[in-house]
From Swiss-Prot:
GO molecular function, one term: phosphatidylinositol binding
Record protein name field: PX domain-containing protein EREL1
Gene symbol of the encoding locus: EREL1
Primary location group: cytoplasm
Species, as recorded: Arabidopsis thaliana
Comp. bias intervals (Low complexity): 172-193
Keyword Secreted set for record: no
Amino acid sequence: MMQRRSPPKHRHDGTSPLPLGMDWSPPPRKWNGRDTVWPHDPRTGWSYCVTIPSWIVLPKSRNSDPVVFYRVQVSVQSPEGITTMRGVLRRFNDFLKLLTDLKRTFPRKGFPSAPPKGLLRMKSRAVLEERRCSLEEWITKLLSDIELARSVVVASFLELEAAARSACQDVDQNASDSNNDRSSTSSSPMVHPSLSLFHAGGSTLTSDYGSDTAYETSEVGSPSVGQDDISEIGTEDLTLDEDLTLTNPIEKLVNFSMSNIDEGLSMSETILEQLEDFPKHKVRSRYVNNILGKDVYNGNASKGVFLANNGSRLLSEPEPSTHSVMHDRNDSAERFALHTGQTSTSGLLISSRDSHLDLRQGPGVSLGTGLVCNPERQGSAQIVLPLELRNKLNRILLATNERLVNAKTDMEDLIARLNQEIAVKDYLNKKVNDLEGELETTKQRSKENLEQAIMSERERFNQMQWDMEELRQKSYEMEMKLKSREDGSSHAEPTVQSTISEKHVLSKELDARKQQLEDLSRRYEELEAKSKADMKVLVKEVKSLRRSHVELEKELTHSLTDKTNAEKLLQEERKLLENTVAARKKLLSDCRILHDRLKEYNLNLSMDGNGNFVDDSTTISDVLRLLSISDDQIEEAQLLSGFDENAAAEDIDKTLSMDTETRIMEDELRKILANIFVENAKLRKQVNSAMLRALQKDVKTTEDVNEENSDEKDEASRETLKR
């Protein structure tokens, strides 16, 4: 027993069981006939898409009501980028039957809900157009599942085999037109007589989704074909669109014979059974694209004809007990794969140069025509590739990998955005829950207030009723007294007069009570109307309170943010003031230090009456030493003042947020003080240098005097010696 295969994960991976190995693709946004650009690379393989562009109303018979049919357009794109279209008419019930069959075939899958059926007695254009759009959206969601898009039920519903045949015929016509010059040098093509025309024999087959009159036996025995894919409609009343009408008789014959998968299977099996008498050791090269292998999913049989890029044709003949499943996966008509299962008979490859080679049962055979057969699985699959197309295949694989990487990055971005949206949604849900809770509390409070008001009004109403009952009882008693007094005939005239007066008083009292009762009833009505008005006012107030509550919350949050900002600004201002005070204190201390240091630079020198310096110290050398020390201290003070200026500049940079005027004043003060100290130091250095020059001059004069005295002494001694 064979193991069940896992569901496919990628499109165009070479495992599609559909004709030509095609896979579903989203429809293009803009249609341009044969040169339509699809939203994927066409070199990956055959692709098909499904759209529902229009609908048509046709009568079921001459005297019956019209029936709405939806035109299902199946577009097929070849690896060369050529687009072909084929239309199929389906009723709304056919779509529902498709969903039922898919649920029966895939019981564990989840399916998108079909559009509601409803009643379309009044077939307005708006309703029909809305249903057409919903059907197109629904079938797009359905086919986005790769496993459903490759299923037999969908292929039968869309008649993919007939669409594949028409696409292959269109591609072959273009290939034959472009290769006329090349094919003129080759030998004349030979076709087996059984491939010239298709003749249907035996019983006719009908599609579950198509018309009941797809094949009707004519008087001469050949199948007469009704209108294409119109279920439950007479052939004499239906006329399809102009783009569905085929002008070529052979195309009509092929489409009529292959209008659905079951009929295509029986026809292909009949034709391939006739091919058993055809010689298998030698075949002329020719494209035979009007016959395609039909896959049988229950494992009965599968035979086919596959064509290569250079005009070679590969025929496979499996054993009667074992059948192979073959699919054509052309990558720009340059590669194809042959999938076989437990085959024991070797295939036959015939090139377009009339070279004849046999493929044996080995794992692979190298061919002299430039084709290499590389086995991927022993005895189960073979891949035939031209040598010159390996580089192109590598480029295609690299491009595919780049697209996969880009798709992965896009998916990660989408996941990140989705996570952000989920977080925002959670936050909004929390906010909504909080608001709902507040709303519930407000509702409860208003409800309690209303109940209290109603209870108080009820109590007042009950009290009023009790008062009315008491008044009625009193009036009844008074009437009884009056009657008893009127009935008493034994009373005297004064008593009669008194009773008349009492009766008059009682009648007045009764009128007063009645007036009071009317007033109370009127007051009750007014209170009831007032209570209703109060209830309306309370409802309005509750609504206004809800709105004001939301606004107050917003104002509260805004005020809290303003408060935090103000506190931050206040803290910064306090820090700036502290820094300012510290900087000023430091400035004063630095000024004191500089002033004290400059005071120490005074020399204890004095001058005599002739203007010469008199040194208090013992020797002139001490004076010179003091002057040098004074110069060094002045230079050190200048460096210290420069350092203080730099430190002050740094403090100013730190307090950027201070007032502009205060900062400018402090900068000017620092500069003025620094200039004063610098000028003072310069003057003190000049004084020291003058004093130094004066001292040096005095020293030189004393030395000259001593030398003159010594010279005079020497001359005197010489003169004495001469004498």
